[in-house]
Amino acid sequence: PSHKDDYAKLNKEWHAKEDQLESKIKETSAKTENLPYAATESVAWYLADDLKMTDATPKGYAQASANESEPTPADIKDFQDTLKAGPIKMLVFNSQEANSTTDQITGAAKDANVPIVELTEQMPKQYTNLLDWMSALVDQFAAAVK
């Protein structure tokens, strides 16, 4: 191809950023390994798994979220009580799906001094590529466990 050198350069830059991200994930996972977290949605599950975290989202709430249905009042209360009890060390909140239920959950997290990592399903406009966005998300997770 006529732009072979350009493509090779871009590929090399991409792989360098990818290696940096993998190193950052490995470094951060030393702090987050086995850390119990809960999530208003499973949007960050793969990243949390890469960070070796433990999903402690109460089962009823998690099932309702996975089925794209509303959690029952008992599920919401269980989530709030679990946040207050202390085993959850981080709440992951999908701000694109904010509603009165997630307001109750994030409110309980704030009351219990549980750090909240806010993220979205779509890459925010301030990022020009996936690797920069993912790197910023890893930074947010790392900052939440300091």
Features from the language model and the residues they span:
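Extracytoplasmic metal-acquisition and chelation regions
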Residues: P1-K146
